[in-house]
Amino acid sequence: MKRYMNAALLYALLAMAGGVFYREFTKFTGFTAKTTLSVVHAHYFLLGMVFFLLLLMLEKTFSFTGTKTGRVLAVYHIGLNLTAAMFVVRGIAQVLGFALSAGLNAAISGFAGIGHLLLGASMILILLRIRHSILPAKS
């Protein structure tokens, strides 16, 4: 359970840092248009902090954590951080007005997509693990 609490705390800090960076970076550059930097804060709060706080409560109630859960959570962490990193990369490019080549634009989108896939697949596996611990075993 300590692992879930530590992860929630880490993602809360990353969410706040992402929000402050978005606000200060856009203010410093005078940028007023829409940018993907604005979603880093929400993604880290909801998919990071809130998700791990929910896992903490579910673990306390149902004790679903097993040997494979750590590996699935590692994939979840990789997926969330890869997604957020690509939001930051694209957002900085938007704010600074970089003209991305077609290849670089596709690479950023591709890595963000891989992050989303890892995030989604690991979330489903965690939910199945929780479901397995809640439902009675079939005889």
Q: Where does each model-flagged region fall?
A:
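Hydrophobic alpha-helical transmembrane segments of multi-pass integral membrane proteins
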Residues: M1-S139
